[in-house]
Amino acid sequence: MKFLDQCKIYVRSGNGGGGAVSFRREKYIEYGGPDGGDGGRGGDVWIEAVEGLNTLIDYRYQQHFKAGTGVHGMGRGRHGAAGDDVLLKVPVGTQVLEEDKETLIADLDTAGMTLRLAKGGNGGWGNLHFKGPVNQAPKYANPGQDGEELWVWLRLKLIADVGLVGLPNAGKSTFLAAATAARPKIADYPFTTLTPNLGVVDLSTSERFVLADIPGLIEGASEGAGLGTRFLGHVERSAVLIHLVDATQDDIAGAWTTIRGELEAYGDELADKSEILALNKVDALDPETRKAKAAELQAVSGIKPMLVSGVSGEGVTELLRAAFTQVRIRRGETPAEAAIDEAPEEETPGGWQP
C-alpha cells in the first residue's frame, strides 16, 4: 500500500428538508386545520481515528465528501427523514487543519476519537407549528437550513514510541529489520527509504514499543534539500530518538553535527528530546578502529555512544532496552521504577530456599 501523510479534502453537510404546507382533508371534517410535518435534518460529516491504518492514501483519489439531504415534511404530520451522515476513517495520529494549513482544528491521537467536521442543516417547520388563535390556517412553512461546507487538510503524524534518525545509508532500515518483524527495503545506496516504516519491538510479553524509521536527512534538509524535513513530523510524538551514525564513514563528527543541526532547524522541540547515540555497522571495524571512532563521536557530542550492528545483531538488545527505559518514563513511570524493573533478579546462593 502506498504511503500518503497529507491531503486536502472538501466536506459538505446536508441541507435540511423543507417543512410542508398541508391541511387535514377528511370526510365530515370541514375545518381540519394544518397538518404539515417538519423537514428532516441534514446529515453530518464526521471523522474518526481508527486502528489498523497508517496512511491517508484513501483520500488521494476521492477528495469530495457530501452528506445526505434531509427529506421534506409531508401531510398528516409526517416528518421527513434525516439525511445520511458521512464517516471518514483516518489513522490514529491524524491532525485536522484549516485551509491555511496552519490552524489546528483537532489532533486525533487516540483510537476512537471523533470530530464533527460539518453539521447538517436543521429541517424547516411545517405549517402545523404556525397555527395560532389569530391565524388558524397558515399557508406557509420554513425551508430547511443550508449545510456547512469547508476545505480541510489532513496531516498524519505516526504514533511511535521511538524514532530512528540519521544520514542516508546509516543503516536505519537494517536496524529496524533486526529489531522488529518489519521488512523495509534495504539496499546499499542513499535514500533507499522514501517513506516512514513502523515496527513493533517485543522485548518480552509485557515489554513492547513501536519503532519508526524515517527517510534519511542530509545537510540543508530544512531548506528542502534531499527529501526535506517533512517526515520528521512522524517522530514528533516519540519519547526518545535513536541517532544512528555510520561507523564506516570518514567524517563521524560531521555526520552527528549535520543531523543535530537539522533537528534544531525543524523546531517543535524535536532537538530537546532524549537522544540515544549509537555507532552502527561496527561489525565492519577492527577493535582499535572501533575505539577511535567511538572516542571521536563522544568528543563532538558529549554522549558516550553505544556500539551496535544491525547485520550481526551486536548491541541491538542493549540499545532497545535503553530506549524502552525512556519510553516507560514517558508513559508515566518514574526513572527509579523503570530501573528496578529492568534490573536482573539476584539468584539465591545455593539455589532455591524455602
Swiss-Prot record:
Transmembrane segments: none annotated. The keyword Metal-binding applies. GO terms for cellular component: cytoplasm. Its EC number is 3.6.5.-. The keyword Nucleotide-binding applies. It comes from the Bacteria. Residues 1-159 form the Obg domain. Residues 339-348 have a biased composition (Acidic residues). It is found in: Cytoplasm. Residues 333-354 are annotated as: Disordered. Mg(2+) binds at S173, T193. PROSITE patterns: G_OBG (PS51710), GTP1_OBG (PS00905), OBG (PS51883). Residues 160-328 form the OBG-type G domain. InterPro entries: G_OBG (IPR031167), GTP-bd (IPR006073), GTP-bd_Obg/CgtA (IPR014100), GTP1-OBG_CS (IPR006074), GTP1_OBG_dom (IPR006169), GTP1_OBG_dom_sf (IPR036726), OBG_GTPase (IPR045086), P-loop_NTPase (IPR027417). PANTHER family: DEVELOPMENTALLY REGULATED GTP-BINDING PROTEIN-RELATED, MITOCHONDRIAL RIBOSOME-ASSOCIATED GTPASE 2. Belongs to the TRAFAC class OBG-HflX-like GTPase superfamily. OBG GTPase family. An essential GTPase which binds GTP, GDP and possibly (p)ppGpp with moderate affinity, with high nucleotide exchange rates and a fairly low GTP hydrolysis rate. Plays a role in control of the cell cycle, stress response, ribosome biogenesis and in those bacteria that undergo differentiation, in morphogenesis control. This is GTPase Obg. It comes from Caulobacter sp. (strain K31).
